[in-house]
Amino acid sequence: MDETVAHRPARPISIARHPIYSMLLPVPVVCFIGALLADVTYLKSGGNLIWLALSSWFLLFGLAFGVLAALILLIDFVRDLTPRTGTGWAHLLFFYAALLVELFSIFIHERDGWTAVAGPGLTLSIIGVVLILIAAWLRRPAVEVVR
């Protein structure tokens, strides 16, 4: 008796056929850019604390959505749904590095006032934005390979 089972290709974790990771990725990108802009505005304003608070909120939301996206990316990667090419690995590493840098950045931003942004806070924000933009840029070729 022939018991062949039809093989259905696995799909990324999705809602209504829309991959969740692709929906979540823009949130940390926008939030980390917003945090950087708030840091620069804080320094230009002479230390208006509203900009420091706004930067911290951007970092918090960016990290929350980023960690969720990172977990989904890892699951898709383990399930072999994200290409394990040089681009796929680079995307994963740049994205995780950006989250790690921004995690350190949020701890720096919890300091008091000027010292939270001037120096290491702004530097970490710049590094985090560069890393997340590279990760987002590398994502497009990785998605096209899957389709």
Per-region residue spans from a language model:
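Cytosolic juxtamembrane helix and N-cap/initiation of the first transmembrane helix
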Residues: 1-29
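Membrane-interface interhelical loops and short amphipathic "cap" helices
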Residues: 9-13, 41-54, 81-83, 112-117
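Transmembrane alpha-helix entry/boundary detector in multi-pass membrane proteins
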Residues: 17-26, 43-65, 87-91, 121
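Core segments of alpha-helical transmembrane spans in multipass integral membrane proteins
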Residues: 30-37, 56-77, 93-103
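Membrane-helix boundary/interface segments in integral membrane proteins
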Residues: 47, 69-86
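Individual transmembrane alpha-helices with interfacial aromatic-anchor signatures
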Residues: 91-93, 117-128
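Membrane-helix boundary connector in multi-pass membrane proteins
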Residues: 103-121
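Membrane-water interface at the C-terminal end of transmembrane alpha helices
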Residues: 130-147
